[in-house]
Design a protein with these regions (language model features):
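Immediate flanking context of iron-sulfur cluster ligation sites
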Residues: 3-6, 85-97, 209-215, 239-247
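Cofactor-cradling patches in redox/metallo enzymes
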Residues: 1, 16-23, 355-359
Length: 359
């Protein structure tokens, strides 16, 4: 993948795909992702059903400037200055159903996890998970990029409560799916040896049957990214095959976050730890960058670029033809990171598209 290093910001499923791609690089080709910053995520939304829902409320998608999740509300900021909001509990009609088999709220396999739950207004909760993540956060604090203090007991209890709610709800859902013959492979505990054995038998046709056709695809774009012959394409709805796979290629099946996950990545009993495995948890703010919940992700990305820790970072901007649609891209420019700070929690479903476009 060359010598370039990238910092990825993504949802739990995207971070999991990045982890699998690099762990099994002899099968997937690897990636330049060197730092993984995961976002807290309860669920994502289907643009198709969101469009239908908004139309029922008298709003067209082209009238929307941006979407945000704020204080338990789903908020649409319109181009004309008006604001439409509903409680998160009422977003069920346009929630992506594949999100209901995920039990990871805090991006458990990232280096650093970031979200708003558990910290005061204009601050972010930061979970430090790896030694690499600790070195980054310690340096950000020491050099003044961020200010941090240990999360309060009340804040951590709230965070654990929300994470447990996702685990409890979605465990019930995926077990029901398994009971009626709709496989949820990512929740089946298997060893590393079993993982290699199973995935080495599978190609895109198997991915189609085991993940896509049963409604488990999260549109992360990992399969498209790792395909060595560009046989997989993703439109706005699902991955499709446009030509035959190479005979001995199993890259897409190894990379997908909704196929098997070995206990080397997700240790047994991880769901019993609502916040996953971690080293430290902080409440953090970054006064130098104006962004949602303190601009903390942006401050970390600026630190990584200014100190040559990575060459590029992933940020979310606006699709020029559809401002409401978040678009992920890679940049080495500090000004791009600062400009994107206000879109911190706008997550884009096709998370690997920026890397694919760079190939």
């Amino acid at each position: 993948m060359g010598n370039k290093k990238t910092a990825m910001v993504g949802t739990p499923c995207q971070i999991l795909a990045a982890t699998k791609i690099n762990r099994y690089e002899e099968k997937t080709g690897g990636s330049p992702i060197d730092v993984k910053i995961g976002l807290f995520c309860m669920e994502n939304f289907s643009y198709q059903y969101l469009k239908r829902y908004l139309k029922s409320q008298g709003i067209e998608l082209f009238e929307v400037k941006e979407f945000r999740i704020e204080k338990g509300q789903f908020v649409a900021y319109l181009i004309d200055g008006n604001v439409f909001k509903i409680p998160i509990a009422e977003t069920e009609p346009f929630t992506r159903k594949n999100c209901h088999i995920c039990t990871d709220y805090t991006s458990d396999v990232s280096d650093i996890s970031v979200g708003s739950v558990g910290s005061p207004k204009y601050q972010s909760t930061v979970i430090v998970r790896t030694e690499k993540g600790k070195q980054i956060i310690d340096a950000c604090i020491a050099e003044g990029y961020i200010e941090a203090e240990p999360i309060s007991k009340k804040g951590q209890e709230l965070l654990e409560k929300i994470a447990n709610q996702k685990i409890t709800k979605n465990t019930r859902i995926y077990k029901k799916r398994e009971a009626i013959g709709r496989p949820v492979l990512s929740k089946r505990q298997i060893s590393e040896e079993e993982f290699y054995d199973e995935c080495s038998k599978c190609q895109f046709d198997n991915l189609q049957n085991d993940v896509i056709s049963v409604g488990a695809c999260v549109l992360c774009g990992a399969c498209e990214y790792v395909c060595p012959i560009e046989a997989i394409q993703i439109n706005n709805r699902k991955p499709v095959s446009i030509k035959e796979c190479e005979e001995e290629c199993h890259a897409c099946y190894f990379a997908c976050p909704r196929t098997f996950i070995s206990d080397a990545i997700y240790p047994e009993g991880l769901d019993e730890q609502p916040l996953g495995e971690y080293l430290e948890i902080y409440s953090v703010k970054a006064d130098s960058i104006m962004g949602q919940d303190g601009g903390v992700v942006s401050a970390i990305l600026v630190y990584l670029l200014e100190n040559d820790i990575v060459d590029e970072v992933s940020v979310v901007g606006e699709d020029k033809d559809a401002p409401w649609r978040p678009e992920s891209y890679l940049t080495s420019k500090i000004q791009d990171v600062i400009k994107a700070a206000g879109t911190k929690y706008s997550t884009t479903t096709i998370g690997f598209k920026a890397l694919t476009n760079k190939k």
